[in-house]
Amino acid sequence: MLRRWVRAGDSVEWFAAGFPGAAPAAVLDGIRIVRAGRQWSVHAQAVRRYRGRLAGRFDRVIDEVNTMPFFTPLWADIPASLLIFQLAREVWWYESRFPISAIGYALEPWYLRLYRDTNAYTISASTRDDLRSLGWRAPITVIPIGIEEVAVEPVGRSAVPTFLYVGRLAPSKRVHDIVKAFYDFQASGPPGRLSLIGDGPLAYVRRLRRLVSSLGIEHAVEFCGRLPVAEKHRRMAQAMALLMTSVREGWGLVVTEAGACGTPALVYDVPGLRDSVRHQESGLIVSPSPSHLASAMRRLVADPPLQQRLAAGARAWSQTFSLDHSAQVLRAAMIASTE
């Protein structure tokens, strides 16, 4: 979206954490990139670099929250807006060890309340409602999140019912639930295949491999790792459905991406995923449990008309989203907030 703002004539500076080998400053597609600090020090570096130095250089600062915000209401000398895709909430318990998990879970509502009078931008009604539950008083704009255009050569569905997961192999994504649901499906349905695309923490990947082995389904489960975009889209187009079981998402952009390939999604009824799927139109939303997911898989395989209807609905729903539109909506909201 920032590239589109630059093309519209805006000047954009993006401050981010550094990484090994990264230049401290660069220009990418017209965007000035400034890097300092690392994961746990980037917030302090932002204060050191920009405190008292924003006015006259910028019209607005966007405080983008990825679990931890930059606390701009406490130090920015120009109006700030909050960009937040999702609250962490339950993710703390899956991705952090005690006591960090408990501390993070307890503190998150309190530090987000510092922004209650700050204009916020998010990508789903679920996150908007989460913010409102914290007593948010300022406007919250939901930005329809788009994707780059997906170009997929026409391919047929795999002869064997194939299900797909795309994303991080991480505890909060509950990929272990997908494996258990697939085992349930295999035990009482036609033979199928499960492809897991993505990587993640080695300990969790090993846990998944042990689970697959203990269930005796190694022959039907493929750990694909990260794939080139074209290959990922080809596999999406061949799959009967995308499976998503996260504890929560901001939206679940891969759902829209799969939909652009004509592939519906079977998802848990959790924040974000219940927004990105239209139940019975672009996919199916089920109660969060492997058994409910397996039932949805069996239902889809046994009902070709449902397959066709959901595939068409997923493609049509995905076509209502574009990055051009996302950039326009967010830019218009930003301009309106400074007038």
Q: Where are the regions a protein language model picked out?
A:
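Nucleotide-activated donor-binding/catalytic signature segment of Leloir-type glycosyltransferases, i.e.
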Residues: 206-227
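Aromatic "clamp/platform" in nucleotide-sugar-dependent glycosyltransferases that forms part
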Residues: 247
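Conserved acidic donor-binding segment of nucleotide-sugar-dependent glycosyltransferases
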Residues: 279-280, 284-290, 299-305
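A conserved mid-protein helix/loop that constitutes part of the nucleotide-sugar donor-binding site
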Residues: 161, 168-184, 189, 206-207
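Membrane-proximal helix-turn-helix segments that form the acceptor-binding/catalytic region
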Residues: 100-120
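Carbohydrate-associated surface elements
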Residues: 126, 146
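Glycosyltransferase donor-sugar binding loop
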Residues: 18, 193-207, 225
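Short hydrophobic beta-strand element within catalytic cores of glycosyltransferases
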Residues: 255, 264-267
